Amino acid sequence: MFLVVGQGNPGERYARTRHNLGFMVLDRLGLSFRPRGEALVAEAEGGLFLKPLTYYNLTGRAVAPLARFYKIPPERILVVHDEMDLPLGRIRFKAGGSAAGNRGVLSIEEALGTRAFHRLRLGIGKPPDPSRGAEYVLSPFREEELPVVERVLEAAKEAVWCWVREGLPPCAGRFNGLDLSLG
């Protein structure tokens, strides 16, 4: 059993924002999601896929109860989320480590009581004005960024299936060096 969590905010208002890349990746998987608790959940490949309805910064409220109920260990949880510390076009697997200011990841860490879960970090780059980070992550991608976003979503979809079927080490080796910003 495993759990893949796509980070994002519910509602049409946020659907195409940088903060919703995790939701966008899960949408690409072609699964049927149904409401369960504070999330939309799909089942496939012997595991669960979760789109929390709690809003980004409270994701742990949806993740922890499901992980506990199904007795899913942290190393079988993958959180797919946007990452300002990576440029747009880069994706990177990571096991554990600091939330680096990502409040959604911190919420999961606090709710699970551990940092040992895996992450698929999707680069969105830094805002032009560092003091406007919240506004930046809640903004839609610019038109000229959309081709790169499309490549990121396709690669991230493949990366999620890789993690599900093969685990972290081979997938990190395959995806961590990719530069999808180049056409």
Swiss-Prot record:
Cellular component, GO, one term: cytoplasm
Entry EC number(s): 3.1.1.29
Protein name: Peptidyl-tRNA hydrolase
Quaternary structure and interacting proteins, as annotated: Monomer.
Superkingdom of the organism of origin: Bacteria
Cited PANTHER family: PEPTIDYL-TRNA HYDROLASE
Record bears the keyword Amino-acid biosynthesis: no
Catalytic activity: an N-acyl-L-alpha-aminoacyl-tRNA + H2O = an N-acyl-L-amino acid + a tRNA + H(+)
Residues under site feature: Stabilizes the basic form of H active site to accept a proton: 82
Main function: Hydrolyzes ribosome-free peptidyl-tRNAs (with 1 or more amino acids incorporated), which drop off the ribosome during protein synthesis, or as a result of ribosome stalling.
Cellular compartments annotated: Cytoplasm
Family: Belongs to the PTH family.
